[in-house]
Amino acid sequence: MAKSKILALTLCAVAALSLSAQSKTFKIGYLPTSIGQPNTNAWQAGMMRVFSKEPTVKLVALDPQLSAQTQVGMMDDLISQRCDAIVLQPVDAAALSGSVRRAESEGIYVVTLNTATLQPHTASVQMADIAAGYLVGEEMGKQIHGRGNVAIIESPPGATLGVNREKGFREAVAKLYPGITIVGAQVAEGWKKENAITIMNSFLQANSELDGVFAVNDNMAEGAMIAAESAGRLAQIKIWGANGQKSTLDLIEQGKIAGTAYNNCFAQGELAAKIVMDSLAKGRLASIPATTDIIQIKPFAAMKDTVSQIPQQDRW
């Protein structure tokens, strides 16, 4: 069970309480799906905007390299270290549920980023993924004039973030554009650009007419762009991503990618850190929550005529 709200992200929404008056050192684990990705780096930078002001807070970052099994082991390690809170981006929402339950049963707050586990926990700060996919479907449909063939480059199984983005996209196409046909959908393992290149090449070979492609994250959208450009068909295909990383925004400005559902990951990380701080100020977690408090951030359609509205300092 979860209770959720969608908001246009403003950092005044949560004012973090200070822990500096307390004598103990607070250890906070950061466990994304992979260290070194634009979004996971931006989340960490956003969190440090909050944590660096607190001399009693220490952040421990671990890299499971996109492996749910490794991530479960690292959760066990953070629990054994007696972390006070863990900020988690689960590789698999089901596979990490047992780890989250164990952490919170031992009094450790868990805040997830982008994907909530099936196990209820303190909070989850997410892009509104269904809304993001719907937004992409709506805007792509306008760009291709409500008709044509489109394809989807999907997320790995178990990644509810990608599943929800695809769900929203399909809902928009079905509701708004009866003249659009989804001609293919394939999973890009590991969300990787090189896998998306291979999938896009297969779409191009199978479809002499292809008008749009939705890749459920920006890395994969960039892979689709590379393949379409190499085939000499980029001008005919509207390629969309989701997340809003800086490299994709640059390609939108160049006219090579049609758009992305943008999320300010710096601010998202900052908000997650403020939730952690407020939770720790209450003392150790007394009991496992019955529901997850889900904060969903409204996406922004970054296209060539709107991308300039995103300030440089908010590009990650």
Model-derived regions: residue spans:
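Hinge/beta->alpha junction and helix N-cap segments in small-molecule ligand-binding domains
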Residues: 31-44, 60-70, 92-93, 115, ...
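Immediate post-signal peptide segment of exported/extracytoplasmic ligand-binding proteins
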Residues: 20-28, 144-147
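Hydrophobic alpha-helical
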Residues: 76-79, 84-104, 169, 184, ...
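Extracellular/periplasmic ligand-binding modules, especially the Venus flytrap/periplasmic-binding
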Residues: 217-225, 265-281
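Hinge/cleft segment of the Venus flytrap/periplasmic-binding protein
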Residues: 24-26, 160-161, 172-174, 271-316
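Flexible loop/hinge segments that line or gate small-molecule binding clefts
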Residues: 93-131, 135, 139-142, 149, ...
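Bacterial N-terminal signal peptides that target proteins for export
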Residues: 1-9
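Bacterial N-terminal signal peptides
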Residues: 8-18
